[in-house]
């Protein structure tokens, strides 16, 4: 048989870039297959055809019976098995050498001085092929090549074991009966050293089973651990690093905000509000301007606690309601003398209050209520004193009822 040194050197280079189980597999291939096949098996099967004899004198009968008994020699069958099983490993070795050569070329280009002319080409440097210890790291495309290498080796092992069983079986019998043409009848043929050949057949079958078991273990070790680790690498799209790299500060949509940022503050300005003067009594407030805030309700008033009262009506009806309110205040004046005044409301005019609010012109305090004793709500607003009316008697009474202090007696009419 030919020289195995060339194939041995190639497989030795591949052993440097394999896992621990892969190195054990290559050791089994070297010692228990190539070495045993080259040293002993060829000597055992050397007289295979010359010592195959049949009890007939018919020319050609012995040759056709040998061809039917052994379609292919065991030695040549095992040589083909070694070549086919080693081919995926050689392909993986070629991939490794290609990556190493590409890295060497890249380093040579980096060492060269940069060209003065031409725009600078932006390219992403690939990950280094070798790790810190100088070994080729099995990751990425190289990892996939290694996994396919193991899978094809396993398939070839299974195929050759099944082929050997269907071609010869796993045992050689000393007697082989042949009735193939041109034999005149069924003839008996005898095989030389059948027991020794059977031992070698079983030995090579055991080595093939060990190699198959190592391939399965390597698939478990590499396919379920390293391949899973490669699939969950930190460069996947849903990791924080990839999202941070893809998000640009000025490239996003202007309508989208970062997840942790506060909503933008929107400032809406209104013109300053001025208290209505005496000359503007009876005029409707301009649309679009905010209404003046209403002071809080007195704490002692019956009704809903804490809710500021409102006097119905729009801003345009303030002048029409002022005389009616003054009359109500004059009628309630006899009842107010027997009661004590409640504490004044200290809410400034600018204090905010919810809901629509209405005010009496001229800064008068207004009260509204039903005649059957229901509680009324009093609103107080502090403004500059209005001009004195024509009747001084009535104005003095009105000034008493519309003073800065609101009394509890004003609530009952």
Curated annotation (Swiss-Prot):
Signal peptide: none annotated. It comes from the Eukaryota. It is found in: Cell membrane; Cell junction, Gap junction. Residues 16-19, 93-149, 220-413 are cytoplasmic. Disulfide bonds join 54-189, 61-183, 65-178. Structural component of lens fiber gap junctions. Gap junctions are dodecameric channels that connect the cytoplasm of adjoining cells. They are formed by the docking of two hexameric hemichannels, one from each cell membrane. Small molecules and ions diffuse from one cell to a neighboring cell via the central pore. A hemichannel or connexon is composed of a hexamer of connexins. A functional gap junction is formed by the apposition of two hemichannels. Forms heteromeric channels with GJA8. This is Gap junction alpha-3 protein. It comes from Ovis aries (Sheep).
